[in-house]
């Protein structure tokens, strides 16, 4: 049987003095209060930028060597992790096997609450064991409270295996922050609605994860200048986006960009190298392989 969790003293569970009368104000006043509280999120993120940068550097090194990004969490936190992982495939051509989310309660938990799942430390071990966690991998455990048993256990098991462990929470001095190799804890203060951590805490977690995964993609060469050069052009909109990226990066006409995209078999990065270095597709692929996919180094 699980011990009852003590929520006293958690910033995310405290009452917000500024919103105690939110049920008595006009709709405009209500959304103004929410907006004022939301502005505190970016300020909280600013204070943990060094930790986010450290997490990016450490995780990128593992990822370059074949390691995986494994996001673990329950409820909103777990869903945010899964969302971050899912988006890396269409945006940066990262294989779903290289970045994925594990939710307490399984795939059904993406759409509905699975009672008791977040309280099971054994379930986290089972899930990570099923995915054959190794020392090359990165475990990103996410929980607003910083003490959800499932997420705590994910860190504990990750450390036992030798994986890099990163926690994303919104409470200082939490078990997760103390256990993880790198702890990221933006303190956003009490929620607008007491304990509703899908609000400010969820927004903070989303911003941290956006920075984290984007930073890794920059480090591994999936971004040139500020262009997503490994986007998968799987539909008409994305084919046009890919064409525009090549046009911008190579400073050529749209018609030429389309020709290079076709010649590069719809791969954006080789198309840019072909256009700027005046080489064929195979040579462009070779050059990218020799420089870890970083176009800026190929063209230096």
Curated annotation (Swiss-Prot):
Location of the SIS domain: 59-222
Keyword check for Lyase: yes
GO BP terms in the entry: amino sugar catabolic process; N-acetylmuramic acid catabolic process; peptidoglycan turnover
Pathway(s) served: Amino-sugar metabolism; N-acetylmuramate degradation
GO molecular function: carbohydrate derivative binding; carbon-oxygen lyase activity; ether hydrolase activity
Record keywords, A-Z: Carbohydrate metabolism, Lyase
Gene3D superfamilies in the record: 1.10.8.1080, Glucose-6-phosphate isomerase like protein, domain 1
Keyword Lyase set for record: yes
Catalysed reaction, written as an equation: N-acetyl-D-muramate 6-phosphate + H2O = N-acetyl-D-glucosamine 6-phosphate + (R)-lactate
CDD domains xrefs: SIS_Etherase (cd05007)
EC numbers, comma separated: 4.2.1.126
Active site: 87 (proton donor), 118
NCBIfam families xrefs: N-acetylmuramic acid 6-phosphate etherase, PRK05441.1, PRK12570.1
Additional information: A lyase-type mechanism (elimination/hydration) is suggested for the cleavage of the lactyl ether bond of MurNAc 6-phosphate, with the formation of an alpha,beta-unsaturated aldehyde intermediate with (E)-stereochemistry, followed by the syn addition of water to give product.
Assembly behavior: Homodimer.
Similarity field: Belongs to the GCKR-like family. MurNAc-6-P etherase subfamily.
Described function: Specifically catalyzes the cleavage of the D-lactyl ether substituent of MurNAc 6-phosphate, producing GlcNAc 6-phosphate and D-lactate.
Protein name per the record: N-acetylmuramic acid 6-phosphate etherase 1
Species per Swiss-Prot/TrEMBL record: Enterococcus faecalis (strain ATCC 700802 / V583)
Underlying gene: murQ1
């Amino acid at each position: 049987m699980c011990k009852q969790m003590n929520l006293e003293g958690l910033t995310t569970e405290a009452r917000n003095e500024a919103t105690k009368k939110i049920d008595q104000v006009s709709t405009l006043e209500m959304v103004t209060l929410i907006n004022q509280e939301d502005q505190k999120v970016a300020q909280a993120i600013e204070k943990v930028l060094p930790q986010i940068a450290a997490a990016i550097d450490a995780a990128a090194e593992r990822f370059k060597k074949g390691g995986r990004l494994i996001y673990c969490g329950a409820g909103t936190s777990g869903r945010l992790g899964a969302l971050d992982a899912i988006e890396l495939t269409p945006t940066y051509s990262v294989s779903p096997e290289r970045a994925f989310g594990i939710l307490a309660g399984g795939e059904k938990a993406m759409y509905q609450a699975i009672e008791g799942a977040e309280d099971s430390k054994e379930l986290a071990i089972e899930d990570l064991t099923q995915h054959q966690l190794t020392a090359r991998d990165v475990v990103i455990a996410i929980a607003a409270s910083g003490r959800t048993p499932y997420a705590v256990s994910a860190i504990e098991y990750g450390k036992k295996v030798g994986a890099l462990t990163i926690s994303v929470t919104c409470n200082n001095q939490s078990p997760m922050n103390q256990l993880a190799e790198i702890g990221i804890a933006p303190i956003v203060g009490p929620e607008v609605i007491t304990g509703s951590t899908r609000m400010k805490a969820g927004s903070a977690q989303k911003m941290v994860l956006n920075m984290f995964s984007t930073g890794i993609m920059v480090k591994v060469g999936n971004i040139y200048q500020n262009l997503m050069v490994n986007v998968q052009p799987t539909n008409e909109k994305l084919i046009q986006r890919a064409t525009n990226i090549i046009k911008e990066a190579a400073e050529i006409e749209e018609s030429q960009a389309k020709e290079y995209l076709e010649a590069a078999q719809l791969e954006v990065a080789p198309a840019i190298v072909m256009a700027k270095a005046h080489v064929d597709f195979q040579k462009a692929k070779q050059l990218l392989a020799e420089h870890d996919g970083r176009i800026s180094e190929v063209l230096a």
